[in-house]
């Protein structure tokens, strides 16, 4: 979407994630991230392709930048030195004049994980409020200060969270559309327990 790489990384850190999303992609392996995305698109009706899919595909297939294990991904990893964002990144993926507000970047990062957790809770894949929160912090690196994915919704308020999801969906696509469970909770102002 033409967002500066530093803006993405800084937003992730401001949100409370241990590392930025691009650094995390490098740690995990960009090729693996691409394979996961393809599986999600194949089996999840709520997912849609976006500009990030092109970025992931080109990083792997065109530029052979797999991640930290190969010393080259979104970051460069010079031996014995501090990592830095790949200098050619913006020449291959130009930055847009119209930047997305930082608040939106932060909430898009956070809300995308929360919405996936709510779908899992709705479909009884996750059946415990405590497990959802603990798993999100320990397994996904979700910001600790939030208390976890479902506690975040409780703190934000189900009605407010639902409304913000609708705003994000209108601006950034259906992936932010609230799940049925959240819509029901917003109507009755019910909290996750």
Sequence positions of predicted segments:
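N-terminal glycine-rich phosphate-binding loop for ADP-containing cofactors
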Residues: 1-193
């Amino acid at each position: 979407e033409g967002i500066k790489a530093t803006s993405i990384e800084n937003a992730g850190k401001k949100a409370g994630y241990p590392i930025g999303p691009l650094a995390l992609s490098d740690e995990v392996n960009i090729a693996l991230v691409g394979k996961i995305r393809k599986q999600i698109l194949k089996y999840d009706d709520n997912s849609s392709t976006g500009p990030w899919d092109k970025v992931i595909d080109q990083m792997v297939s065109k530029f052979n930048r797999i991640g930290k294990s190969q010393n080259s991904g979104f970051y460069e990893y010079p031996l014995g030195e501090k990592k830095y964002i790949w200098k050619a990144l913006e020449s291959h993926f130009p930055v847009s004049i119209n930047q997305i507000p930082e608040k939106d970047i932060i909430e898009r990062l956070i809300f995308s994980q929360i919405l996936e957790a709510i779908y899992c809770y709705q479909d009884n894949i996750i059946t415990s409020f405590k497990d959802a929160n603990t798993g999100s912090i320990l397994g996904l690196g979700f910001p600790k200060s939030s208390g976890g994915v479902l506690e975040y919704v409780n703190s934000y308020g189900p009605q407010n969270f639902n409304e913000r999801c609708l705003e994000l969906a209108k601006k950034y696509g259906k992936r932010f559309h609230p799940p049925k469970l959240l819509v029901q909770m917003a109507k009755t102002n019910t909290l996750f327990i």
